[in-house]
From Swiss-Prot:
Homodimer. Mg(2+) binds at E37. NCBIfam families: RdgB/HAM1 family non-canonical purine NTP pyrophosphatase (TIGR00042). Its EC number is 3.6.1.66. Its cofactor is Mg(2+); Mn(2+). GO terms for cellular component: cytoplasm; nucleus. HAMAP family: HAM1_NTPase. This is Inosine triphosphate pyrophosphatase. It holds the Pfam family Ham1p_like. Gene3D superfamilies: 3.90.950.10.
Length: 190
């Protein structure tokens, strides 16, 4: 099976994907590509990024887009979480929910696989949780303020293996792995 290029410039994201998928994907290589970010839903952004990357690189690509939605704010900041983090940080994100009793949130991860000239295939994983005051190391985005439902720790406080077995990214990648396994099975029977 042909190799797949994972388009990211985020070393933490690449490491986490590799930790989760192991060798389940066909020869996953990495390439940083500065892609224009559309405004829209995570799905719209993912489709556009995947089509653009596949056309530029002329090879199958896998891209990922993550959003963090606050229920009290109808899903904001959503796919704009990266810019909110850069602008206001953990404290500012918490302040956005000041005055709201509802601190519930959801983390959504969308992977898009695209071959040149084809429509992307989307894979989504979602984890519900709460927005809390920052706890744990601040090394990976909004992990210190997101506490998944059923846990008393934030993503940042969790052991890496635990986080990688319950996260929104894990759930989406489980679907990606399933897709590539079925693709591999079809190739074996052809």
């Amino acid at each position: 099976m042909q190799s797949v290029v994972f388009v990211t410039g985020n070393a933490n994201k690449l490491r986490e994907v590799q930790d989760i998928v192991g060798n389940a994907l066909p020869m996953l290589t990495c390439h940083q590509l500065d892609l224009p970010e559309l405004q829209g839903t995570t799905q719209t952004v993912s489709i556009h990024k995947a089509k653009t990357a596949a056309a530029i690189l002329k090879t199958p690509v896998l891209i990922e887009d993550t959003s963090l939605g606050f229920v009290a704010l109808n899903g904001l900041p959503g796919p704009y979480i990266k810019w909110f983090m850069e602008s206001v940080g953990h404290v500012g994100l918490n302040a956005m929910l000041h005055g709201f009793d509802d601190k519930s949130a959801f983390a959504l991860c969308t992977f898009a696989y695209c071959e040149p000239g084809h429509d992307p295939i989307l894979f989504e994983g979602r984890t519900d949780g709460l927005i809390v005051h920052p706890r744990g190391p601040a090394g990976f985005g909004w992990d210190p303020i997101f506490q998944p439902c059923g846990f008393t720790t934030t993503y940042a406080e969790m052991d890496k293996d635990l986080k990688n077995s319950i996260s929104h990214r894990y759930k989406a990648l489980a679907l990606v792995k399933e897709f590539f396994q079925s693709k591999s099975d079809l190739a074996l029977h052809s």
